[in-house]
Amino acid sequence: MSSIILRFRSKDGMFRITTDSSSNFTLVLEQLIEKLSQSGNNGNGNGNNNKIDLQSLTIANKPQDKGKSSYEFQNQTVNELGLKNGDMLYVNYESVTNDSGPTTTATNTTTNTASGNTIPITGPVPSIPINSVVTSHGPLKVEELPIDQELDKEDGLITRPLSSMCRHGPKGMCEYCSPLPPWDENYRKDHAIKHISFHAYLKQQLEKLKSSGGSYFPPLDPVDYSIDLTCNQGHKPYPNGICSKCQPSPITLQLQKFRMVDHLEFADSFILNDFINVWRVSGVQRFGYLYGRYAKSEKTPLGIKAIVETIIEPPQHDELDGITLLDWDQQEEKMVDQVANKFGLYKVGIIFTDLTDAGTKNGKVLCKRHKDSYFLTNLEIIMAAKFQLKYPNISKYSTAKNNGQFSSKFVTCVISGGLNGEIEPRSYQVSTSAEALVKADIITGCTQPSQIYVNESNNHRYVPDIQYSKINKYGLEVKSNAKPTFPGEFLLVSLTDSFPLQPTPIFTNSYVIENREFLGDENHDIQSLKTLHNYLKSNNDQIFNFHFILHLIKTHILNDQEIDLLIEYIKSKNLEDYLKLVESNGWMTLMTILEQSV
């Protein structure tokens, strides 16, 4: 964004401050205070530096106005105040003498805009220095995920052993063995880490803020490519009028340096195999929601991994080459989420298959997704962005205007063929730019799956200039016009995925999975009282399956307290909890009904 000049007239002369419209107005005031302090006039020609009583500093749009305290502009940007290049503001303040002290004031502040409007803000001003007021407004008070709270307390420093270059004892430290920050570029390249972790990126931004010595401002600010249809800066709303305040800036797309989630782990291989079996039996594709939890990933500094404990398959119509999602009853989906939350699980992503038999009769499948074709199609990228917008990440370091939301931890996993014909999962997210492009309705799919089409402007959508930037083989940055299409890979963020060497899943056995009635074979029964009876008879006290719990809740035989007893037993696997469950009235009623139904 281009720089602008704001003019400030005071009793010690006029001062010009160069800034840009996205800057926090507090940074402008800090520059102004520094110039006022160095003016050396003080109104009496004694040549000494001004000593400003910061509590008396007010800003107005007219020379006669008393104006408002500077404190009240602390959390607003130049753009939000409606200030334009060349605007004149009038500064009033008192000089501090050696025997004078701070005073408490309650003032009214107004600033003039390019259109002659004023912005009134009222309120009492505390008698503390301006820097203290600004820095006291730190991170938001929002409820973050436990993993974010845990990683926020860690420094993430990468320890290094003594090297041959060290010239000191075991208790010494030098540049060759001192810890590295978690965002270190050389470490990332040496360990083949494609993206730094979200918390490494966050700490890098906080470090930049700290080293600048400026006031606190949120280091996470989601991009917004939408035009402001409510802009009233002296013109009619778009499309009948437009100005630099309401229109989005030109967009430059580049590969995102960080990722919100670094790794996707399936708690046990049978979770994925059970999902893929639908294709093995029927040849049609399948879609599911990943329910799991977040934990630290040891492979990446300050990394996060999503551990999948179960897959829920909503109502859908499956075909050989596609999937159509049907309406999922909201009450049922809410019930699934609530039960999952009692296990400390959330929706962490989606999963779908894209498998085609290779015809070799040895279990191999076609490899359709690779660097010369695509990893996710344009429609899949847009779908992933919509899911990420639906399930936002909450961070106290984001802005209040976004309610603490910044990007998402929601993962998209596709099961497809590898280079050697093996079936393998591949996990992705899309960038914050992709989320903003979809939210602003700027992009859509096209006939070439690897390319994304840029929409045209219309009465409700303004599409700015869009470029995408990449590094060529000579190490130089090259920018290309993104219209009408650009490669979808510029919106992708890739994750790693795996299975644990020593699985410890919450749910350890199998049960009939819902919404698979169309399979109709002996290995895929429909959920019924008979399947409940057979499951309980064959497993005794080993009733550790999420789909079993959901089916049991749908029968409405057990009350809420008895369902909680069942969940507590599955979590603890304690025999005492099991005895409490089987001795309950609801469980005995269930056994009676099942015995009579056989």
UniProtKB/Swiss-Prot annotation:
Subcellular location, principal:
cytoplasm
Q: Does the keyword Protein transport apply?
A: yes
Where in or outside the cell it occurs: the entry states: Cytoplasm, Perinuclear region; Endoplasmic reticulum membrane; Nucleus membrane
Q: Where is the MPN domain?
A: 264-403
Q: Name one Pfam family in it.
A: zf-NPL4
- Which stretch is the leader sequence? none
- Span-the-membrane segments of this chain are none
The annotated regions of Low complexity compositional bias extend over 99-118
Tell me if Protein transport is a UniProt keyword of this record: yes
Region (Disordered) residue ranges read 99-119
Q: Enumerate the UniProt keywords alphabetically.
A: Cytoplasm, Endoplasmic reticulum, Membrane, mRNA transport, Nucleus, Protein transport, Translocation, Transport
Return one GO MF term: K48-linked polyubiquitin modification-dependent protein binding
Give the matching InterPro entries: MPN (IPR037518), Npl4 (IPR016563), NPL4_C (IPR007717), NPL4_Zn-bd_put (IPR007716), Ubiquitin-like_domsf (IPR029071)
The way it spans or sits in the membrane comes to:
Peripheral membrane protein
What GO CC annotations are associated with the protein? Cdc48p-Npl4p-Vms1p AAA ATPase complex; Doa10p ubiquitin ligase complex; Hrd1p ubiquitin ligase ERAD-L complex; nuclear membrane; nucleus; perinuclear region of cytoplasm; replisome; RQC complex
A single GO BP: positive regulation of protein localization to nucleus
**Family membership:** Belongs to the NPL4 family.
**Functional note:** Involved in the import of nuclear-targeted proteins into the nucleus and the export of poly(A) RNA out of the nucleus. Has a role in the endoplasmic reticulum-associated degradation (ERAD) pathway.
User: Protein name, please?
Assistant: Nuclear protein localization protein 4
Organism from which the protein derives: Candida albicans (strain SC5314 / ATCC MYA-2876)
Highest lineage ranks of the organism? Eukaryota, Fungi, Dikarya, Ascomycota, Saccharomycotina
Gene label? NPL4
